[in-house]
């Protein structure tokens, strides 16, 4: 698949997450928007809520990870979404513009930023904490950076 610049989770781990949500999640129509879509919800080990939507016509798959949190306004406590990240694969579709060739699949991941009114209307790069939470959900160890170099030689 054609992978967008700056991805942190990666396509392979995304597909592992798709598999886990399909196996352990609950099938539901509450998260779908079109007729030929199938949806699943899954509650992660850390309380994060995952929604998976698969378009049966195109093969596109989208996972939204919401990390619930709390907020206090005056003397009221509110439940809010602390972090919303979306990961998706858009399958390459051949059409008139591709001259019969199927373009590569596209994979992307974004963090959705909420505005002052609570709607998610801006995007940013997925943060490392979110990726770490997903890797822990999948029981996959974090990739350690290579050691060595000058710091190693100086006795670090």
Feature names for model-found ranges:
Residues 1-156:
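Short low-complexity linker/loop segments enriched in small residues
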